[in-house]
């Protein structure tokens, strides 16, 4: 069977499984998720062995450190995946819930009911944990899903897929509700993008090149998980000691992820006190500063002059753009010009400035006095996420169970006819 026929067959089976899954009981879906959590814990050694094969191949191919970090699984990350399964299992099931109702003058009762999106195709790179997060969220929301992970994670993804199939079968749900593409041929992506008859929405999660390619090819709606060019603005009068720790966490904890900080904008009145403290705190961790002319002498030996192309750059590394700005207007203008609608934060003591920043910074999450690293489904209480949408339609920000459903109108009558 050639790739086009294989992918069309997967789409057809996903559509059939999706119809069954949409009608599945909340207990069956929760049971599958709980069983998957147990399987992850019981089969940890096999998962780590599969991941070790991926890591060895990646190292031989010269993969850079940030991508290796995203590829790597550990006992701790497997425990986190199991915990996410149980958390999502315990969430309220949105499918079939009537969220709001109103009565018309003619007596009709009108409501909006939550329903699955249908069949989702997920295209992603590097991170094997996305296989689990995507599967459990789609399952909970009643969606069938076709998962196409990166070739660098093929052994890990297939090992996880086997557990998902076992968990689904254990409660009588169709195994085809979650399918992982087993070939690493990149032609799969183009074939998935053609299947508008069987796939309702496609979600690319990865580098800019991947996302642009999917947007260009897809015949169905695309929910984009675009790059994370995240900024922090240090306002005049901010708590500088607190801000140093926020910036350190946002940049250093995991520099290769999409909610890591990439740009630091500092009010001119705070630069002399704040930037040397930042240089000391982050410089000890090996951070390189790409600094504007005014900030360069305040950052010491860890700083080099910024270039124009550093603006709007997602470094995925221990590199931080630093600019001194005159006021919030200039900070917001910079964010509007170079941000990616992902995450923006402000450190401030001024309530009015905080509220203005929340209103005017255009991003899927805007935070006051908190790290950009909190733009994450688990951290925001969603249990897990299938991605962080930087598109405003149909969802904006981390996409949990609720965001993987839509609504339809339901009408209750007593014989009314239209006059």
From Swiss-Prot:
Please give the coiled-coil regions recorded for this protein: none
A molecular function (GO) term: glutamate-5-semialdehyde dehydrogenase activity
The GO biological-process annotations, alphabetized, read as: L-proline biosynthetic process
The protein's matches in InterPro entries, at most eight in alphabetical order, are given as: Ald_DH/histidinol_DH, Ald_DH_C, Ald_DH_N, Aldehyde_DH_dom, G-glutamylP_reductase_CS, Glu-5-SA_DH, GPR_dom
EC supergroup of this enzyme: oxidoreductase
Described function: Catalyzes the NADPH-dependent reduction of L-glutamate 5-phosphate into L-glutamate 5-semialdehyde and phosphate. The product spontaneously undergoes cyclization to form 1-pyrroline-5-carboxylate.
Q: Which family does it belong to?
A: Belongs to the gamma-glutamyl phosphate reductase family.
Would you tell me the protein name for this molecule? Gamma-glutamyl phosphate reductase
What is the native source organism of this protein?
Nitratidesulfovibrio vulgaris (strain DP4) (Desulfovibrio vulgaris)
* Gene assigned in the entry: proA
